[in-house]
UniProtKB/Swiss-Prot annotation:
Residues 473-486 have a biased composition (Basic and acidic residues). Signal peptide: none annotated. Expressed in hematopoietic progenitor cell lines Ba/F3 and FDCP1. Not detected in brain, lung, liver, kidney, thymus, spleen and bone marrow. Deubiquitinating enzyme that removes conjugated ubiquitin from specific proteins to regulate different cellular processes. Has deubiquitinating enzyme activity for DNAH5, suggesting a role in the regulation of DNAH5 degradation by the ubiquitin-proteasome pathway. Has growth-suppressing activity; induces arrest in G1 phase upon controlled expression. The keyword Protease applies. One of its GO terms (molecular function) is cysteine-type deubiquitinase activity. The gene is Usp17la. It comes from Mus musculus (Mouse). The keyword Hydrolase applies. It catalyses: Thiol-dependent hydrolysis of ester, thioester, amide, peptide and isopeptide bonds formed by the C-terminal Gly of ubiquitin (a 76-residue protein attached to proteins as an intracellular targeting signal). Residues 51-348 form the USP domain. This is Ubiquitin carboxyl-terminal hydrolase 17-like protein A. Polyubiquitinated; ubiquitination leads to its subsequent degradation. Induction: Up-regulated by IL3, IL5 and CSF2.
Length: 526
């Protein structure tokens, strides 16, 4: 599906570089962002993966989309805080309350092997028991949750603007700039976005597609720009940049034709860590790193057929493949090899957990082109013997290292003195062979004489043992709905009806009756 970005036609009065309206519009954007920044947007505690979701018939697309939202760190923490449901006036039909119940039940009150059935409130307005586009359902769900937030905000603050935690988490701002090629006057317009659609028809990677999005478009001929300063239509250039980056970056790879629904099934590489700074309208300061936490995948030939699943990164840092009711471990290598449809990135600055945070040294390694050169220089420096003075080394480098150097000759003297004292103490002055003495002297010097003071920006990373790649499940056909669930739960707890209690009493005599044949419990979130 191709998403068209439309921008308001530029006001000719704004073509002058010093037009005051331009700065006022930008100030409003910054002010709104500042107001929205009051929400806590990070994992407050490490969470494991959520439970699987029941396929009610061609519902794999909404299951995959809901799993990606459930494992969005800022959104999950907002849902777990119960902030909205405590003030909502109509929770029985509120989509945000339904999403809050789904996330809470999935992350906090489920066990391994449990299966949940998404609430009818979340799915009824969109799902018609046929295959749909997962990205369209994502945008529909975000907008309906945004409207639910606005209803509460307008009741408490009638004068509040159209801002919500949903836009605070996923919302960013485009800056569309038109520049007159004669007088160099510019006109800027700002528009909010919740996702970034990318044309991948000629791109080999997400980074290349991002660069293609920002290519300058020439406005000439019938499409020429009316310059307010020149007072006539003039050739101009139009550029599109991210002006304010979102906290959660949702990148959509346009794989489906808007007319036929046919899929562009080509490999497009995407990184685990992405620096958005080069794509900003004003790229100042340090890197703006994002970490991948979810990948939504479509396996099929058209948007009306095939199967959807996703890979998500849980709060404790491990990756899982969420395929309807099946939840299986996977590694980041297999995740990066998927034929992705929608990518989810989160700003590193908004994550607190070490298991998710990328260490500063890792950020530099991925984002800074000069880091590899610096790293190789440090490796060469570490290979030098601490017993040999490097007289050709600059003084400032020796000062930085702050290593107390000892020559090989001094090492021999210390060795002989130490062994002589030891021999006198035990009544034996016999010295060890010279080869062994060299080794022991080196050990003593390393333990007592050599002091290594790492620089302030040095980082020590202990790599875990590599594990074997987890097997990847081949995409299956649509899963059939589960039947004969042994235990039905809602977001408020067990369903205490006479029939269920009677059935439960009959089953208690059998061992393990709290699970079905697949070892799964069906949880109903109402």
């Amino acid at each position: 599906m191709v998403v068209a970005l439309s921008f308001p036609e530029a006001d000719p009065a704004l073509s002058s570089p010093d037009a005051p309206e331009l700065h006022q519009d930008e100030a409003q954007v910054v002010e709104e962002l500042t107001v929205n920044g009051k929400h806590s947007l990070s994992w407050e505690s490490p969470q494991g993966p959520g439970c699987g979701l029941q396929n009610t018939g061609n519902s794999c697309y909404l299951n995959a989309a809901l799993q990606c939202l459930t494992h969005t760190p800022p959104l999950a923490d907002y849902m777990l805080s119960q902030e909205h449901s405590q003030t909502c006036c109509s929770p029985e039909g509120c989509k945000l309350c339904a999403m809050e119940a789904l996330v809470t039940q999935s992350l906090l009150h489920s066990h391994s092997g449990d299966v949940m059935k998404p609430s009818h409130i979340l799915t009824s307005a969109f799902h018609k028991h046929q295959q749909e586009d997962a990205h369209e359902f994502l945008m529909f769900t975000l907008e309906t949750m945004h409207e639910s937030c606005l209803q509460v905000h307008r009741q408490s603050k009638p004068t509040s603007e159209d801002s919500s935690p949903i836009h605070d988490i996923f919302g960013g701002w485009w800056r569309s700039q038109i520049k007159c090629l004669l007088c160099q006057g510019t006109s800027d317009t700002y528009d909010r976005f919740l996702d970034i659609p990318l044309d991948i028809s000629s791109a080999q990677s997400v980074k290349q597609a991002l660069w293609d999005t920002e290519k300058s478009e020439e406005l000439c001929g019938d499409n020429a720009y009316y310059c307010g300063k020149c007072r006539q239509k003039m050739p101009a250039s139009k550029t599109l940049h991210v002006h304010i980056a979102p906290k959660v970056l949702m990148v959509v790879l346009n794989r489906f034709s808007a007319f036929t629904g046919n899929k562009l099934d080509r490999k497009v590489s995407y990184p685990e860590f992405l620096d958005l700074k080069p794509y900003l309208s004003e790229p100042t300061g340090g890197p703006l790193p994002y970490a991948l936490y979810a990948v939504l995948v479509h396996d099929g030939a058209t948007s009306h057929s095939g199967h959807y699943f996703c890979c998500v990164k849980a709060g404790h840092g491990k990756w899982y493949k969420m395929d309807d009711t099946k939840v299986t471990r996977c590694d980041v290598t297999s995740v990066l090899n998927e034929n992705a449809y929608v990518l989810f990135y989160v700003q590193q600055a908004n994550l607190k957990q070490v298991s998710i945070d990328m260490p500063e040294g890792r950020i530099n390694e991925v984002l800074d082109p000069e880091y590899q050169l610096k790293k190789s220089r440090r490796k060469k420096h570490k290979k030098k013997s601490p017993f040999t003075e490097d007289l050709g080394e600059p003084c400032e480098n020796r000062d930085k290292r702050a290593i107390k150097e000892t020559s090989l000759g001094k090492g021999k003297v210390l060795q002989e003195v130490n062994h002589k004292k030891a021999g006198q103490k035990h009544g034996n002055t016999k010295l060890m062979p010279q080869k062994q003495n060299h080794q022991k002297a080196g050990q003593n010097l390393r333990n007592t004489e050599v002091e290594l003071d790492l620089p302030a920006d040095a980082i020590v990373i202990h790599q875990p043992r590599s594990t074997a790649n987890w097997g990847r499940d081949s995409p299956d056909k649509e899963n059939q709905p589960l039947h004969n669930a042994d235990r039905l739960l809602t977001s408020q707890g067990p369903v205490n009806t006479w029939q269920l209690c009677r059935q439960e009493g009959r089953r208690r005599s059998k061992k393990g009756q709290n699970k079905n044949k697949q070892g799964q419990r069906l949880l109903l979130v109402c």
